[in-house]
Curated annotation (Swiss-Prot):
Residues 1-16 have a biased composition (Basic and acidic residues). This is Transmembrane protein 255B. It comes from Mus musculus. It is found in: Membrane. Residues 1-80, 318-349 are annotated as: Disordered. GO terms for cellular component: membrane. It comes from the Eukaryota. It is a multi-pass membrane protein. It holds the Pfam family FAM70. The chain crosses the membrane at residues 129-149, 244-264. Keywords: Membrane, Transmembrane, Transmembrane helix. Its main location: membrane. Residues 318-329 have a biased composition (Low complexity).
Length: 369
């Protein structure tokens, strides 16, 4: 790649030196070849591979001077469209404008995206946007699940009122004991009497939440094992609600971000809207006047002549521009071609042109010699 780049630069330097000797009359050979290639491009065609005569990545075309107006071929005259609409032009240029020929951004130095398709001026390729939306969807689903789990756990299994009121006790069992190997029995008092509760070391227990003599488990946790104090349980309760709020916020932001990326993926560059191909002319048919009007081809101030019975596609090539549109069919009482004024260019001889075509369902006028 480095050797090819050096050869292209040496070729450009030799051509610049030769152009200076000849007074700047000749154009650069490689630039004229690229302009000729640009003039024969088709906007919607995509080729399978790169062009064989393209310069390597990082050539001197990024700083190429602006080509003169007379050097631009007829195929690209007046069009400031980007040449990156074809995959074969990806390794050559990004755009052709009065300012010059610009190399594609993928072939600037330190670029690692030289093999992707050209996306016509988008911020990122469509695949990147689609992958981002998919990963954001996974994050949105995960945030929703975490918010549900944290909120349900904090709301149903932790009762903060006895903890905040100081009605829970902490049992440590002394130093050197682990909470899973040392157990003791404590006495809890309730409305039904008193009962014995086995607790482990480093446990915060609440007798108000423990149902003495009941075989059904308590809906709320009455003991918390492996804490340093009962205040740690209060902190855990607050952290669960903070995690729920953050997960809900991440859920909303993920949905909004996915929507914005979807909008960016479907955006069209402003250059395509400004310099895109013009739409085909619309054909408007008025059954009352039997006239085919071609919008976009005829000026609105042009009058409709009365001496021609040929529509626009059937006019002879030598006809004047004033006869661009005419009646499709003539009734019996209308003026015949032999009654036209001589100043309008009509002759009494039969017209050598082909008769007009009529729309389906319409009756042609009778033959008049």
């Amino acid at each position: 790649m480095v050797g090819a780049e050096g050869r292209w630069r040496e070729k450009g330097n030799d051509q610049r030196r030769g152009r200076k000797k000849r007074g700047g009359v000749e154009e650069s050979g490689h630039r004229a070849a690229f302009l000729e290639t640009a003039g024969t491009l088709k906007p919607n065609h995509r080729a399978g591979g790169a062009s064989g005569h393209c310069p390597p990545s990082g050539g001197h075309f990024g700083n190429a001077a602006a080509p003169t107006a007379r050097a631009r071929p007829s195929g690209s005259a007046g069009h400031h469209r980007g040449l990156c609409q074809e995959e074969e032009d990806l390794s050559v240029v990004c755009g052709l404008s009065p300012a010059g020929v610009y190399s594609h951004p993928d072939h600037w130095p330190c670029c690692n995206h030289q093999d992707r398709e050209c996306d016509c001026g988008r911020l990122l390729p469509r695949d990147y946007f689609a992958a981002s939306i998919v990963f954001l969807s996974f994050g949105v689903v995960a945030a929703f699940c975490c918010a549900i789990v944290d909120s349900v756990f904090a709301a149903r299994h932790i009762e903060p009122r006895p903890l905040s009121a100081g009605r829970c006790q902490f049992y440590s069992s002394g130093a050197g004991y682990l909470y899973d190997v040392y157990q003791t029995e404590v006495t809890c008092y309730s409305l039904n009497g008193r009962c014995q509760l086995k607790v482990r070391s480093n446990t915060c227990y609440c007798c108000d939440l423990y149902a003495c003599g009941s075989t059904e488990p308590s809906p709320a946790y009455y003991e918390f094992v492996g804490v340093r104090s009962c205040q740690d349980v209060v902190h855990l309760y607050r952290l669960l609600w903070v995690s729920t709020v953050l997960n809900v916020l991440g859920l909303c932001l993920g949905i909004v971000t996915a929507a914005v990326l979807g909008a960016f993926k479907d955006m069209v560059p402003l250059s395509q809207l400004a310099y895109g191909p013009s739409p085909p002319p619309q054909i408007l048919y008025n059954p009352a006047q039997q006239i085919l009007a071609y919008t976009g081809l005829c000026p609105p101030s042009m009058g409709v002549p009365t001496c021609s019975s040929y529509p626009l596609p059937l006019q002879p090539s030598s006809a004047p521009p004033a006869s661009a549109s005419a009646d499709l069919s003539l009734p019996e009482d209308t003026e015949s071609p032999s009654q036209c004024q001589p100043s309008r260019g009509c002759s009494h001889a039969p017209s050598p042109c082909t008769p007009a075509y009529f729309l389906p369902g319409e009756k042609p006028p009778p033959y008049a010699p």
